[in-house]
Curated annotation (Swiss-Prot):
Coiled coil: none
UniProtKB keywords: Leucine-rich repeat, Repeat
Composition bias, Basic and acidic residues: 1-10, 33-48
SUPFAM superfamilies xrefs: L domain-like
Annotated spans, Disordered: 1-71
Record protein name field: Leucine-rich repeat protein soc-2 homolog
Record family assignment: Belongs to the SHOC2 family.
Gene3D superfamilies from the UniProt entry: Ribonuclease Inhibitor
InterPro entries in the record: Leu-rich_rpt, Leu-rich_rpt_typical-subtyp, LRR_dom_sf, LRR_domain-containing, LRR_R13L4/SHOC2-like
Family annotation (Pfam families): LRR_14, LRR_8
Record keyword Transcription present: no
Organism name: Nematostella vectensis
GO molecular function: volume-sensitive anion channel activity
């Protein structure tokens, strides 16, 4: 492969998520964005409560009045006085530049919810422990390192949010807050979770994400009411078998740890719908995982797995997204075609797979995105033309030397990535892909482009960099929607006049065509052109001082010397990349 020169990555391709790592699209995060609202009781004070309704999948707001920047103008004493006089049950002092809480806070005995997000509090005063009715205490984004012991008096506390603080050790008092249902400790500096965590038997949501924890204690199995557990982005070296006792678990996030294996007991978590296993040290998966049939997104990217349990995929009846990237698969996952009947996204890039079996996607009527980039494929299966639901196909960085003519049946394709293969030509049937927006064939061995390319009227990005092209078809002028055209590092001797019809063209890369002696006058008709690269092109038909002046001067010269010198200057490329 040749090193590509004279190009810059465009945000257009990145936004399509073709060359990006797909793992993040399926990453799991426990829903700990804000404190969980407490149960609403019917009492005369209910009219003084402000409740927050959180829709599934929508990031909840911690407070009703959101302050985008810290406000030193807020008079905390007046807020507390007002709260006391009204007998309010909720106080929001979030993002108010608070450093010290006043002692009169203890007088707010009716308070049920206290929000102190985004302040500068380093020490929580013991007065907070004197709020007997407090159910929600939100302290995210402060400078706390510990908590006062008398918080143990908060016998009604259900939600404790300590995200984004400076806690190195979980304060002992937390292990005594036995009424907690929600505990968020993510983004701290915690290295140890003591066995006292087992005391919090009512916990439903626990987040320890982004800490420095190595060992998850076995008593985690005593938290039988857990619904979501997020211990991702730590240094966890084991998952205790007792995790199987948490039978109400629906979301378990273990990604970015050092876990070498999963216990068989994980198969008891039959309510689970989300399981995050990305970037661990897993070399295999237990057969019992097939019992977790409700999982809809299965992502094991970045492990050492070479094969899946035989019946696993067939058992995941709700599976819509499957990511097996960056493992050690040498063969396609075994199993009948029905295992993909609900799958819409299948990503298996960066493995060692040599073949996609015939008929494997016969039942995959919803499959819209297939990424098998960076494997060892030499061809595509004979039934390739039956993958008619595909919208995005990425087979880059393989050893494919020929595309099947049946590609004409993939009429829903919008993105086709074929870069870094061994293709010498494209089938004429490619002209049938009328919805295609991105066609990337960089670093192949193409000697020509079929004239049928003219039918790709929806095409916006065409990448032909680093091939063996001696010319471009005149029909390229029909591609009036193309904004990005890269034909650098080829063997072009000319550019067709019809390029002037590409009215949407914004970026044109002609760099490193060592036989390119001239440019057509029609380039001046590309009124949207902003960037043109002509680096390392001789362009001997033009005056050397003009070429040395760069693309802007070249365009001006073509305009003045050609038949279009009476036209209004609608745009001149300003840079040579």
């Amino acid at each position: 492969m040749r090193r590509t020169k004279g190009r810059t990555d465009s945000p257009d391709v990145q936004s399509l998520n073709i060359n990006a790592d797909y793992g993040e699209a399926a990453s799991l995060t426990a829903d700990d964005s804000t404190a969980h609202k407490s149960d609403k009781k019917h009492d005369p004070e209910a009219k003084k409560q402000v409740t927050i309704t959180v829709q599934p999948g929508v990031k909840p707001k911690p407070t009703v009045k959101k302050r985008s920047t810290p406000s030193a103008d807020l008079d905390i004493h007046k807020e507390i006085q007002k709260c006391r006089e009204e007998g309010a049950t909720r106080l929001d002092l979030s993002k108010a530049a608070v450093t010290v809480l006043p002692k009169e806070l203890k007088e707010l005995t009716s308070l049920r919810e206290l929000y102190l997000y985004g302040n500068r509090i380093a020490v929580l005063p013991p007065e907070v422990g004197l709020l007997p009715n407090l159910e929600t205490l939100a302290l995210s984004e402060n400078n706390l390192t510990t908590l006062p012991d008398n918080l143990v008096k908060l016998t009604k506390l259900k939600v404790l949010d300590l995200r984004h603080n400076k806690i190195k050790e979980i304060p002992d008092v937390i292990y005594k807050l036995t009424t907690l249902t929600t505990l968020y400790l993510r983004f701290n500096r915690i290295s140890v979770v003591e066995s006292g965590i087992g005391n919090l038997k009512l916990l439903e949501r626990l987040s320890l994400r982004e800490n420095k924890i190595k060992i998850l204690p076995r008593v985690i199995g005593q938290l039988v009411h857990l619904v979501t557990l997020d211990i991702s982005h730590n240094h966890i070296e084991n998952l205790p078998a007792e995790i199987g006792n948490c039978v109400h678990m629906t979301s378990l996030d273990l990604q970015h740890n050092d876990i070498p294996s999963l216990p068989d007991s994980i198969g008891r978590l039959t309510a689970m719908t989300r399981l995050g296993l990305r970037y661990n040290q897993l070399s295999s998966l237990p057969d019992s995982l097939a019992n977790c049939s409700g999982i809809d997104e299965f992502n094991i990217e970045g492990n050492n797995i070479a094969e899946l349990p035989e019946k696993l995929l067939s058992s995941l009846k709700n599976l819509t997204s499957l990511t097996l990237s960056r493992n050690k698969f040498e063969v396609f996952p075994a199993g009948p075609p029905k295992q993909f009947c609900q799958v819409n996204t299948f990503i298996m890039e960066h493995n060692r797979m040599q073949k996609i079996p015939f008929g494997v996607f016969n039942k995959a009527k919803y499959l819209s995105k297939l990424n098998v980039k960076d494997n060892q494929l030499t061809s595509l299966p004979l039934d390739f033309g039956s993958w008619i639901s595909l919208v995005e196909l990425n087979v880059a960085t393989n050893q494919i030397s020929k595309l099947p003519e049946d590609i004409q049946w993939l009429v829903n394709l919008e993105v086709l990535i074929l870069s870094n293969n061994l293709l010498k030509k494209l089938p004429r049937g490619i002209g049938a892909l009328r919805k295609l927006r991105v066609l990337d064939i960089e670093e192949n061995k193409l000697e020509s482009i079929p004239t049928e390319i003219e039918y790709l009227r929806s095409l916006e990005r065409l990448v032909l960099q680093s091939n063996c092209l001696g010319s471009l078809p005149r029909s390229i002028g029909y591609l009036s929607s193309v904004t990005y055209l890269s034909v650098g590092e080829n063997e072009l001797v000319s550019v067709p006049q019809e390029i002037g019809n590409m009215e949407s063209l914004e970026q044109l890369y002609l760099n490193d065509n060592e036989n390119l002696q001239s440019l057509p006058y029609e380039l001046v008709l590309c009124g949207s052109l902003q960037i043109m690269s002509i680096e390392n092109c001789p362009l001997s038909a033009l005056p050397s001082q003009i070429v040395a002046g760069g693309p802007s001067l070249v365009i001006q010269y073509l305009r003045l010397q050609g038949p279009y010198n009476g036209m209004v200057d609608t745009g001149v490329p300003t840079s040579d990349v």
